[in-house]
């Protein structure tokens, strides 16, 4: 079973590390190509491209400039401990045991605009480059064209290594678009999280993102290997709705808090 999640814009390079172990990202040659393109942009151009403030544009221009391909614990941090968004609030990797990190390293992948695919313990230097950004490059007009089949091939390698063919898609649509489902040697299962509001169940972005992290944590902590085991997920009040689910899509609901 391979879990896919999105990265986060918010980063943490300060808090204590839950593990000293680390690995190197596997697609750094490609990352370097993107860094070369990003360095051509001025801070105002970055601000316009990413729709961010002048302050954030300056920060990310500096990050692109400072980025170097030799990753060490001094200039980089394990990806699963560096990302700090809603998904990662649910995941709570800072509480993982070494055995949890072992399982996650094999079964969890973070999709990334700059790094393509990251394993949890892969070192990562700080960056902001969302998958949907239209950064022109040698391969085309955006990052989807840049990555092409590369991300899908890397995921197929991971599935082959674990002798499995189940992908749990907990990534956002923006990031999952970088995967080619028809070329993925897997059965793809997408959990959907609906929260009740005024008597109706719907996707509420903040809650859904956190729930993707909660589900990832549930799989990792319980060492799940079969998709049917996901239906027992009940973190923070969610419950499986078999009637609303269909092939390839598992629906979880939660009553209004």
UniProtKB/Swiss-Prot annotation:
Q: Which cellular component appears as one GO term in the record?
A: cytosol
Output one GO BP term: response to hydroperoxide
Signal peptide, first to last residue: none
NCBIfam families reported in the protein's UniProt record: PRK02101.1-1 (NF002541), PRK02101.1-3 (NF002542)
Family per UniProt?
Answer: Belongs to the UPF0246 family.
Which protein are we looking at?
UPF0246 protein Ent638_0568
Source organism per UniProt:
Enterobacter sp. (strain 638)
């Amino acid at each position: 079973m391979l879990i896919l999640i999105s990265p986060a814009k918010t980063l943490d390079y300060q808090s204590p590390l839950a593990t000293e172990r680390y690995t190197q990202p596997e697609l750094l040659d490609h990352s370097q190509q993107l860094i070369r393109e990003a360095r051509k942009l001025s801070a105002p151009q970055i601000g316009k491209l990413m729709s961010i403030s002048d302050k954030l544009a300056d920060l990310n221009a500096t990050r692109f400039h400072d980025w170097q391909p030799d990753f060490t614990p001094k200039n980089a941090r394990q990806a699963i401990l560096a990302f700090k968004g809603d998904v990662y609030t649910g995941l709570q990797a800072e509480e993982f045991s070494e055995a949890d990190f072992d399982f996650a390293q094999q079964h969890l992948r973070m999709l990334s605009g700059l790094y393509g695919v990251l394993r949890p313990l892969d070192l990562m230097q700080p960056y902001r480059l969302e998958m949907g950004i239209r950064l022109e490059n040698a391969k085309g007009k955006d990052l989807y064209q840049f990555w092409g089949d590369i991300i899908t091939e890397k995921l197929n390698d991971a599935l082959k290594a674990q002798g499995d063919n189940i992908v749990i898609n907990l990534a956002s649509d923006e990031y999952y678009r970088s995967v080619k489902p028809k070329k993925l040697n897997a059965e793809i299962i997408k959990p959907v999280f609906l929260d009740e509001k005024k008597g109706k169940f719907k996707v509420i972005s903040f809650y859904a993102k956190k729930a993707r992290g909660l589900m990832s944590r549930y799989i990792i902590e319980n060492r799940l290997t079969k998709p049917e085991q996901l239906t027992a997920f009940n973190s923070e009040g969610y419950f499986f709705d078999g009637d609303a689910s269909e092939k390839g899509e598992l629906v979880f609901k939660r009553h209004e808090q």
